[in-house]
From Swiss-Prot:
Job description of the protein: Catalyzes the ferrous insertion into protoporphyrin IX.
Upper classification of the organism: Bacteria, Bacillati, Cyanobacteriota, Cyanophyceae, Oscillatoriophycideae
PROSITE patterns, alphabetized: FERROCHELATASE
Compartment list: Cytoplasm
Protein name: Ferrochelatase
CDD domains, per the entry: Ferrochelatase_C, Ferrochelatase_N
EC number(s) stated in the UniProt entry for this protein: 4.98.1.1
GO BP terms: heme biosynthetic process
């Protein structure tokens, strides 16, 4: 089989407070995150958003220690994965490639090229596929393969998603049971799945399978859990003026409180590592929302991190992928079914959906604000807001 490598893909996160603004810039400069009608608008808008959001985001990171633990956790997952595969007689080297912060995907590929591998397994640490997560990283890699003749000599395979892998489901069930058992009446606690949201148009227009995979994953977990508890699936982390997948986490928590729910356990279903959206958004912001709504006992299931069953599921995914026909970028990022990796460019026109039009109008507003910030003149300065 020769020298085998595994490339773990993840979002990345700022290591310290000074990294927050450039991290946000990298995030919003990704055309898979924000859809714009012309590529030249991407970086100016990313600069504006990252500048406006940096202060609030830094305050959030201060609440969890001043930086994201995502890099350390991902590296620990990589170490545990290599050890598990070694126990099974499969020697691999594991690399970590982050999309928006160090170690960037490009850094990982540079190391891979130096190591002169024979085979590479590309494994995103996103259980469910979305064009804005795994898809974005795949597009970066696809372009590198297209333009680098050395990479073209490397055999590779992609693992697009693994939300239905039995050991992943078992690991989630194990953690959920542990939290449920902390309640006086475990079967009466409401189970609340909170997934990272995406704009509704990604699903309806671009054919993103994310919502379907999230819903199927939730059902598989509840079936394996085998408990009578009521449960809810909602979506968090909405950004911007357009409609995202619903129901929203905050609205759902308030509604459950109004219905008289007192015991609640939250499961971060789309995250496998602790980071800002579990440690700050769920543990602090949503806990406060829940308590104000009358929910008395708020618990959260920890992220999988290096849970033994989770690491074993990753190891099985790797070994299975090495025995199967390779999955290529063309198969994953350019499928025959109705899914388009959004977009590197959108055409202008009035015949698109209202949501896209609203997004474009919002983009124009952002650009107008950018001009006012640069010029120091405009209506916001006139009324004293700026």
């Amino acid at each position: 089989m020769g020298r085998v490598g595994v490339l773990l893909l993840n979002l990345g996160g700022p290591d310290k407070l000074e990294d927050v603004r450039p991290f946000l810039f990298n995030l919003f400069a990704d055309p898979e995150i924000i859809r714009l009608p012309a590529p030249w608008m991407q970086k100016p808008l990313a600069w504006l958003i990252s500048t406006l959001r940096a202060g609030k985001s830094q305050e959030n990171y201060k609440e969890i220690g001043g930086g994201s633990p995502l890099r350390q956790i991902t590296e620990a997952q990589g170490t545990a994965l290599a050890q598990k595969l070694a126990e099974w007689g499969q020697e691999v080297k594991v690399y970590v490639g982050m999309r928006y912060w160090h170690p960037f995907t490009e850094e990982a590929i540079a190391e891979i090229k130096k190591d002169d591998l024979d085979q590479l397994v590309v494994l995103p640490l996103y259980p469910q596929f979305s064009i804005s997560t795994s898809g974005s990283s795949f597009r970066v890699l696809e372009e590198m393969w297209r333009t680098d003749k050395d990479l073209n000599q490397l055999d590779y395979t992609l693992i697009p998603s693994w939300y239905d892998h039995p050991q992943y489901i078992a690991a989630m069930v194990d953690l959920i049971r542990q939290e449920l058992d902390q309640f006086d009446n475990p079967d009466q606690a409401h189970i609340f799945f909170s997934a990272h949201g995406v704009p509704q148009s990604y699903v309806e227009e671009a054919g993103d399978p994310y919502q379907r995979e999230i819903e199927e994953c939730t059902k598989l977990i509840m079936e394996a859990l085998g408990r009578p508890n009521d449960y809810t699936l909602a979506y968090q982390s909405r950004v911007g003026p357009v409609e995202w997948l619903q129901p929203y986490t905050e609205d759902s928590l308030i509604a459950l409180g109004e219905k008289g729910v007192k015991d609640l356990v939250v499961i971060p279903i789309s995250f496998v590592s602790e980071h800002i959206e579990t440690l700050q958004e769920i543990d602090i912001e949503y806990r406060e929302v829940a308590e104000e709504a009358g929910i008395e006992n708020f618990r959260r299931v920890p992220a999988l991190n290096t849970h033994p069953l989770f690491i074993e599921s990753l190891a099985n995914l790797v070994t299975d992928s090495l025995e199967q026909c390779p999955r290529t970028f063309g198969q994953v990022t350019h499928p025959k079914e109705n899914m388009k990796m959004y977009p590197q460019e959108l055409s202008w026109g009035m015949n698109t959906s209202a949501e896209v039009l609203n997004g474009r109008l919002a983009m124009i507003g952002f650009l107008a604000l950018l001009l006012e910030l640069i010029s120091g003149q405009g209506p916001l300065h006139f009324v004293g807001i700026m």
